[in-house]
Amino acid sequence: MTSDWKEFTLGDITDLVIDYRGKTPKKLGGDWSKSGYRALSAKNIKTGRIVQPDTIRYVDEEMYQKWMKDEVKRGDILITSEAPFGQIFFWDSDEKIVLSQRLFCVRIKSEYDPRFIYYYMITPEFQGELDGRATGTTVVGLRQPELMKCKIRCPEIQNQKAIAEILSSIDAKILANDKINDNLQQQASALFDSFYKRAIVEVGFTEIIQILGGGTPKTGESSYWNGLIPFFTPKDV
């Protein structure tokens, strides 16, 4: 029962916060590299995923040592502070990375299961509190002190681990299905491209389609409404 769960602030259960949001290679006397250590920024984090891999930059060994006085470790939680705001990622790798723009790294105390904390942080309850603590109008962002005030509710450690294991297995299945779908989409695209290149007849798009315009029944005519046939508007598509 969740009524038995204890409530803490994120700061209560956090061992370390890594925050290098103001750093850049130029400020450290260097520049980006063509290869080396990946530098992840907020735009590369979407809850549960690394995205836009083509935008990821790199630094060499010397720059990495200057930049990352505290290193990201397996089990850490990455949180975007703005643009986009409130995206969460569980770092489940031994790869060494650089924390770049608009990104916090939170390390949870050993008495708590970090994967469970990650799953709690992506719940509507926690995300709603993040929204409430954010500031800004044009660009919405979150300051570290406000992040640490956010509330976390936890069961006993054995239950944390059990819940995290179940949710992790579901995530793994989703990821596997996504990879299958990506592969099928690539195959379909390649097959279509092959057919397209062999086409010998070219026609205009409007020659093979029929365009139908919609309308709205009179709202004052009750016989037009509350029937069994669905009525779609643009917002339903």
Regions found by a protein language model. Give the residues of each.
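Non-catalytic DNA-recognition/assembly elements of restriction-modification systems
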Residues: 1-23, 149, 153-215
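A short glycine-rich beta-alpha junction/loop motif
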Residues: 3, 81, 97-104, 115, ...
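A short beta-sheet element
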Residues: 41-42, 58-126, 143, 233-234
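Short glycine-enriched loops at secondary-structure junctions
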Residues: 45-46, 83-85, 135-136, 214
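N-terminal alpha-helical segment
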Residues: 52, 99, 146, 187-188
